[in-house]
């Protein structure tokens, strides 16, 4: 399953929509909830400075759209 993680690059400033970034994780889990928990743990362990805003499971249609926009790249820690 592919998860899109929305985050701010620092926890020092208040979150602003304009500075929200995203990364994509490919996580092999049995449930959506387990995937969200695993995604949060991976990001917090590898990028503790990131302020995670939201974690979204991408449907097939959303995944296709993300690939078409050119911003899609799986992050590996």
UniProtKB/Swiss-Prot annotation:
Domain of life: Bacteria
GO cellular component: DNA-directed RNA polymerase complex
E.C. designation(s): 2.7.7.6
Record Gene3D superfamilies: RNAP, epsilon subunit-like
Catalyzed chemical reaction(s): RNA(n) + a ribonucleoside 5'-triphosphate = RNA(n+1) + diphosphate
GO molecular function, one term: DNA binding
Similarity annotation: Belongs to the RNA polymerase subunit epsilon family.
Assembly description: RNAP is composed of a core of 2 alpha, a beta and a beta' subunit. The core is associated with a delta subunit, and at least one of epsilon or omega. When a sigma factor is associated with the core the holoenzyme is formed, which can initiate transcription.
Protein name from the UniProt record: DNA-directed RNA polymerase subunit epsilon
Record gene name: rpoY
């Amino acid at each position: 399953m592919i998860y899109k993680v929305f985050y701010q690059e620092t926890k020092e400033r208040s979150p602003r929509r304009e500075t929200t970034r995203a990364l994509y994780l490919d996580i092999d889990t049995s449930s959506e909830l387990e995937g969200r928990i695993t995604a949060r743990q991976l990001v917090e362990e590898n990028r503790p400075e990131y302020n995670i805003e939201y974690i979204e499971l991408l449907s097939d249609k959303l995944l296709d759209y993300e690939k078409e926009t050119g911003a899609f790249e799986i992050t590996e820690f």
